[in-house]
Protein backbone atom coordinates (compact mmCIF):
# COMPACT_ATOMS: atom_id res chain seq x y z
CA UNK A 1 0.00 0.00 0.00
CA UNK A 2 2.84 2.40 0.82
CA UNK A 3 4.48 1.66 -2.54
CA UNK A 4 1.21 2.19 -4.42
CA UNK A 5 0.59 5.51 -2.65
CA UNK A 6 4.15 6.60 -3.40
CA UNK A 7 3.63 5.98 -7.11
CA UNK A 8 0.31 7.84 -7.06
CA UNK A 9 1.84 10.83 -5.30
CA UNK A 10 4.65 10.82 -7.88
CA UNK A 11 2.03 11.21 -10.61
CA UNK A 12 1.62 7.63 -11.86
CA UNK A 13 -1.60 5.82 -12.67
CA UNK A 14 -1.58 2.47 -10.87
CA UNK A 15 -3.38 -0.82 -11.49
CA UNK A 16 -2.81 -3.41 -8.78
CA UNK A 17 -3.50 -7.13 -8.36
CA UNK A 18 -2.40 -9.63 -5.71
CA UNK A 19 0.76 -11.72 -6.05
CA UNK A 20 -0.71 -14.69 -4.19
CA UNK A 21 -4.30 -15.93 -3.72
CA UNK A 22 -4.07 -15.63 0.08
CA UNK A 23 -1.80 -12.61 0.52
CA UNK A 24 -4.24 -9.74 0.01
CA UNK A 25 -5.56 -7.89 3.06
CA UNK A 26 -9.08 -6.85 2.11
CA UNK A 27 -9.13 -3.77 4.34
CA UNK A 28 -5.93 -2.45 2.74
CA UNK A 29 -7.27 -3.16 -0.76
CA UNK A 30 -10.53 -1.39 0.10
CA UNK A 31 -8.68 1.66 1.41
CA UNK A 32 -6.65 1.94 -1.79
CA UNK A 33 -9.77 1.47 -3.92
CA UNK A 34 -11.47 4.26 -1.97
CA UNK A 35 -8.55 6.50 -2.95
CA UNK A 36 -9.20 5.74 -6.63
CA UNK A 37 -6.59 3.05 -7.26
CA UNK A 38 -7.65 0.25 -9.62
CA UNK A 39 -7.62 -2.85 -7.40
CA UNK A 40 -8.13 -6.43 -8.62
CA UNK A 41 -7.62 -8.75 -5.64
CA UNK A 42 -9.22 -10.13 -2.51
CA UNK A 43 -8.23 -12.59 0.17
CA UNK A 44 -8.95 -16.25 -0.54
CA UNK A 45 -9.07 -16.20 -4.33
CA UNK A 46 -8.95 -19.51 -6.18
CA UNK A 47 -6.43 -20.01 -8.99
CA UNK A 48 -8.87 -19.00 -11.73
CA UNK A 49 -9.83 -15.80 -9.90
CA UNK A 50 -6.16 -15.03 -9.25
CA UNK A 51 -5.30 -15.08 -12.95
CA UNK A 52 -8.52 -13.26 -13.84
CA UNK A 53 -7.34 -10.40 -11.62
CA UNK A 54 -3.99 -10.30 -13.42
CA UNK A 55 -5.81 -10.20 -16.75
CA UNK A 56 -8.00 -7.33 -15.56
CA UNK A 57 -5.02 -5.35 -14.31
CA UNK A 58 -3.34 -5.73 -17.71
CA UNK A 59 -6.24 -3.96 -19.44
CA UNK A 60 -4.42 -0.93 -18.06
CA UNK A 61 -1.66 -1.42 -20.71
CA UNK A 62 1.26 -0.81 -18.31
CA UNK A 63 4.53 0.98 -19.00
CA UNK A 64 6.18 -0.55 -15.92
CA UNK A 65 5.48 -3.88 -14.22
CA UNK A 66 6.26 -4.60 -10.57
CA UNK A 67 6.10 -8.30 -9.87
CA UNK A 68 6.41 -10.70 -6.92
CA UNK A 69 6.63 -14.23 -8.28
CA UNK A 70 6.72 -13.28 -11.99
CA UNK A 71 3.09 -14.25 -12.73
CA UNK A 72 2.39 -10.81 -14.19
CA UNK A 73 5.42 -10.94 -16.49
CA UNK A 74 4.66 -14.54 -17.48
CA UNK A 75 1.08 -13.62 -18.38
CA UNK A 76 2.27 -10.76 -20.58
CA UNK A 77 4.78 -12.99 -22.37
CA UNK A 78 2.51 -16.01 -22.76
CA UNK A 79 -0.84 -14.36 -23.52
CA UNK A 80 -0.41 -10.66 -24.23
CA UNK A 81 2.75 -10.06 -26.22
CA UNK A 82 0.97 -7.14 -27.89
CA UNK A 83 1.60 -5.26 -24.62
CA UNK A 84 5.39 -5.75 -24.73
CA UNK A 85 6.24 -2.74 -26.96
CA UNK A 86 4.51 -0.48 -24.44
CA UNK A 87 6.52 -1.79 -21.47
CA UNK A 88 9.72 0.10 -20.61
CA UNK A 89 10.81 -2.47 -18.02
CA UNK A 90 9.89 -4.21 -14.80
CA UNK A 91 11.04 -5.43 -11.41
CA UNK A 92 10.86 -8.82 -9.71
CA UNK A 93 10.95 -8.96 -5.93
CA UNK A 94 11.35 -12.55 -4.83
CA UNK A 95 13.85 -15.39 -5.19
CA UNK A 96 11.49 -17.76 -6.97
CA UNK A 97 10.42 -15.13 -9.48
CA UNK A 98 14.03 -14.20 -10.26
CA UNK A 99 14.83 -17.87 -10.92
CA UNK A 100 11.91 -18.09 -13.37
CA UNK A 101 12.93 -14.92 -15.20
CA UNK A 102 16.59 -15.92 -15.40
CA UNK A 103 15.50 -19.12 -17.13
CA UNK A 104 13.49 -17.01 -19.59
CA UNK A 105 16.43 -14.66 -20.18
CA UNK A 106 18.84 -17.55 -20.77
CA UNK A 107 16.42 -18.99 -23.32
CA UNK A 108 16.14 -15.61 -25.05
CA UNK A 109 12.45 -15.40 -24.19
CA UNK A 110 12.43 -12.32 -21.93
CA UNK A 111 11.16 -9.45 -24.07
CA UNK A 112 11.91 -6.47 -21.82
CA UNK A 113 14.47 -5.66 -19.09
CA UNK A 114 13.66 -6.63 -15.51
CA UNK A 115 15.49 -5.49 -12.38
CA UNK A 116 16.06 -8.38 -9.94
CA UNK A 117 15.18 -6.63 -6.68
CA UNK A 118 15.98 -9.84 -4.83
CA UNK A 119 19.65 -9.47 -5.80
CA UNK A 120 20.02 -6.23 -3.85
CA UNK A 121 22.04 -6.66 -0.66
CA UNK A 122 19.35 -4.95 1.37
CA UNK A 123 16.84 -7.54 0.12
CA UNK A 124 18.97 -10.67 0.02
CA UNK A 125 20.88 -10.28 3.28
CA UNK A 126 18.26 -8.46 5.32
CA UNK A 127 14.66 -8.94 4.17
CA UNK A 128 15.15 -12.59 3.19
CA UNK A 129 16.97 -13.54 6.38
CA UNK A 130 15.39 -11.39 9.07
CA UNK A 131 12.09 -10.37 7.46
CA UNK A 132 11.14 -13.81 6.14
CA UNK A 133 12.45 -15.47 9.29
CA UNK A 134 10.31 -13.38 11.60
CA UNK A 135 7.19 -13.27 9.42
CA UNK A 136 7.25 -17.05 8.93
CA UNK A 137 7.31 -17.69 12.66
CA UNK A 138 4.66 -15.00 13.13
CA UNK A 139 2.44 -16.75 10.58
CA UNK A 140 2.88 -20.11 12.31
CA UNK A 141 2.03 -18.62 15.70
CA UNK A 142 -1.07 -16.82 14.40
CA UNK A 143 -2.35 -19.99 12.73
CA UNK A 144 -1.60 -22.39 15.58
CA UNK A 145 -0.90 -20.55 18.87
CA UNK A 146 1.62 -23.34 19.49
CA UNK A 147 4.57 -23.04 21.90
CA UNK A 148 7.76 -23.15 19.81
CA UNK A 149 10.17 -23.82 22.69
CA UNK A 150 11.16 -27.48 22.86
CA UNK A 151 9.63 -28.37 19.50
CA UNK A 152 11.60 -30.10 16.75
CA UNK A 153 11.36 -27.61 13.88
CA UNK A 154 12.42 -28.96 10.49
CA UNK A 155 13.51 -26.30 7.98
CA UNK A 156 13.88 -27.51 4.40
CA UNK A 157 16.53 -25.43 2.66
CA UNK A 158 19.28 -23.32 4.21
CA UNK A 159 19.39 -20.44 1.76
CA UNK A 160 18.85 -16.92 3.03
CA UNK A 161 15.15 -17.50 3.81
CA UNK A 162 15.66 -20.94 5.34
CA UNK A 163 18.54 -19.68 7.44
CA UNK A 164 16.35 -16.84 8.69
CA UNK A 165 13.58 -19.24 9.70
CA UNK A 166 16.09 -21.53 11.43
CA UNK A 167 17.61 -18.63 13.38
CA UNK A 168 14.24 -17.29 14.54
CA UNK A 169 13.03 -20.77 15.54
CA UNK A 170 16.26 -21.37 17.45
CA UNK A 171 15.81 -18.02 19.18
CA UNK A 172 12.38 -19.16 20.40
CA UNK A 173 13.88 -22.30 21.93
CA UNK A 174 13.21 -24.85 19.20
CA UNK A 175 15.44 -27.79 18.37
CA UNK A 176 16.11 -26.98 14.72
CA UNK A 177 16.79 -29.60 12.06
CA UNK A 178 17.86 -28.54 8.55
CA UNK A 179 17.44 -30.55 5.36
CA UNK A 180 19.64 -29.38 2.49
CA UNK A 181 20.83 -30.94 -0.78
CA UNK A 182 23.99 -28.81 -1.15
CA UNK A 183 26.90 -30.33 0.81
CA UNK A 184 28.52 -26.91 1.27
CA UNK A 185 25.32 -25.29 2.49
CA UNK A 186 24.60 -28.27 4.74
CA UNK A 187 28.06 -27.82 6.27
CA UNK A 188 27.27 -24.14 6.92
CA UNK A 189 24.10 -25.19 8.75
CA UNK A 190 26.10 -27.68 10.82
CA UNK A 191 28.69 -25.06 11.76
CA UNK A 192 25.89 -22.71 12.84
CA UNK A 193 24.75 -25.35 15.32
CA UNK A 194 21.86 -26.99 13.48
CA UNK A 195 21.34 -30.71 13.02
CA UNK A 196 21.35 -31.74 9.37
CA UNK A 197 19.57 -34.81 8.00
CA UNK A 198 17.48 -35.95 5.06
CA UNK A 199 13.75 -35.28 4.94
CA UNK A 200 13.16 -39.03 5.18
CA UNK A 201 14.91 -38.97 8.56
CA UNK A 202 13.48 -35.65 9.71
CA UNK A 203 9.89 -36.66 8.89
CA UNK A 204 9.88 -39.15 11.76
CA UNK A 205 10.93 -36.66 14.46
CA UNK A 206 9.68 -33.23 13.39
CA UNK A 207 6.90 -31.35 15.16
CA UNK A 208 6.82 -28.38 12.77
CA UNK A 209 7.94 -28.47 9.13
CA UNK A 210 8.76 -25.36 7.08
CA UNK A 211 9.78 -25.59 3.42
CA UNK A 212 11.95 -22.77 2.07
CA UNK A 213 13.47 -24.07 -1.15
CA UNK A 214 11.54 -22.82 -4.18
CA UNK A 215 11.59 -26.44 -5.41
CA UNK A 216 8.59 -28.74 -5.84
CA UNK A 217 7.85 -31.95 -3.91
CA UNK A 218 9.98 -31.36 -0.83
CA UNK A 219 7.37 -33.05 1.38
CA UNK A 220 5.54 -35.92 -0.33
CA UNK A 221 3.47 -39.00 0.50
CA UNK A 222 6.21 -41.05 2.18
CA UNK A 223 7.01 -38.15 4.49
CA UNK A 224 3.38 -37.61 5.51
CA UNK A 225 3.12 -41.31 6.34
CA UNK A 226 6.15 -41.06 8.64
CA UNK A 227 5.07 -37.94 10.56
CA UNK A 228 4.00 -38.10 14.17
CA UNK A 229 0.44 -37.32 15.23
CA UNK A 230 -0.12 -33.57 15.38
CA UNK A 231 2.69 -32.53 13.03
CA UNK A 232 2.38 -29.01 11.62
CA UNK A 233 3.35 -28.47 7.97
CA UNK A 234 3.80 -25.16 6.17
CA UNK A 235 5.68 -23.47 3.35
CA UNK A 236 7.44 -20.13 3.14
CA UNK A 237 8.41 -20.35 -0.54
CA UNK A 238 6.37 -18.31 -3.00
CA UNK A 239 4.42 -21.16 -4.64
CA UNK A 240 2.33 -24.01 -3.25
CA UNK A 241 4.38 -26.78 -4.88
CA UNK A 242 6.89 -27.54 -2.12
CA UNK A 243 4.38 -29.44 0.03
CA UNK A 244 2.61 -31.95 -2.22
CA UNK A 245 -1.03 -31.32 -1.30
CA UNK A 246 -2.25 -33.93 -3.80
CA UNK A 247 -0.34 -36.61 -1.89
CA UNK A 248 -1.79 -35.40 1.41
CA UNK A 249 -5.31 -35.47 -0.03
CA UNK A 250 -4.82 -39.12 -1.06
CA UNK A 251 -3.97 -40.06 2.53
CA UNK A 252 -6.79 -38.22 4.27
CA UNK A 253 -9.84 -39.68 5.94
CA UNK A 254 -11.28 -36.22 6.58
CA UNK A 255 -10.26 -32.56 6.72
CA UNK A 256 -11.59 -29.64 8.74
CA UNK A 257 -10.55 -26.07 9.40
CA UNK A 258 -9.63 -25.71 13.07
CA UNK A 259 -8.43 -22.10 12.94
CA UNK A 260 -8.00 -19.46 10.25
CA UNK A 261 -5.36 -20.75 7.80
CA UNK A 262 -5.07 -24.05 9.68
CA UNK A 263 -6.60 -27.29 8.36
CA UNK A 264 -6.53 -30.57 10.27
CA UNK A 265 -6.04 -33.59 8.01
CA UNK A 266 -7.09 -36.82 9.71
CA UNK A 267 -5.17 -39.54 7.90
CA UNK A 268 -6.31 -43.09 7.29
CA UNK A 269 -3.60 -44.25 9.72
CA UNK A 270 -5.31 -42.28 12.50
CA UNK A 271 -2.71 -39.53 12.76
CA UNK A 272 -3.43 -35.83 12.32
CA UNK A 273 -1.42 -33.38 10.24
CA UNK A 274 -2.06 -29.65 10.40
CA UNK A 275 -1.55 -27.85 7.08
CA UNK A 276 -1.15 -24.08 7.27
CA UNK A 277 -2.26 -21.61 4.57
CA UNK A 278 -3.11 -24.46 2.19
CA UNK A 279 0.60 -24.99 1.58
CA UNK A 280 0.97 -21.46 0.25
CA UNK A 281 3.20 -18.73 1.64
CA UNK A 282 2.63 -18.93 5.39
Predicted regions and their residues:
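N-terminal ligand-binding/catalytic initiation module
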Residues: 1-121, 256, 260, 267-270, ...
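Glycine-rich phosphate/diphosphate-binding loop of Rossmann-like nucleotide-binding domains
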Residues: 1-4, 8-11, 127, 131-205, ...
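Short acidic, glycine/serine/threonine-rich loops at helix termini
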Residues: 3-4, 27-30, 52-53, 74-81, ...
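Generic secondary-structure signature for well-ordered alpha-helical cores
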Residues: 12, 37, 62-63, 70-74, ...
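Adenosine-phosphate binding glycine-rich loop
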Residues: 13-15, 43, 112-150, 245-282
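Residues in the short beta-alpha loop(s) of Rossmann-like NAD(P)-binding domains
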Residues: 20, 181-182, 239
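Flexible loop/turn segments at secondary-structure boundaries
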Residues: 73-74, 122-124, 162-163, 185-186, ...
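Rossmann-like adenosine-cofactor binding region
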Residues: 186, 190-271
Amino acid sequence: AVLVKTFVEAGADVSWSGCNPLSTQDDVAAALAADGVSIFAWHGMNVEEFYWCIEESLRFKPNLTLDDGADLIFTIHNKHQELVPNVIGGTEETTTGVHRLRSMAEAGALKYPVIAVNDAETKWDFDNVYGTGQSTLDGILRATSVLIAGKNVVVAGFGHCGRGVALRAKGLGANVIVTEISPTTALKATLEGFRVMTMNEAATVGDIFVTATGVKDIIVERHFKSMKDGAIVCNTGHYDCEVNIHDLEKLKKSVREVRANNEEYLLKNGRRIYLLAKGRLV
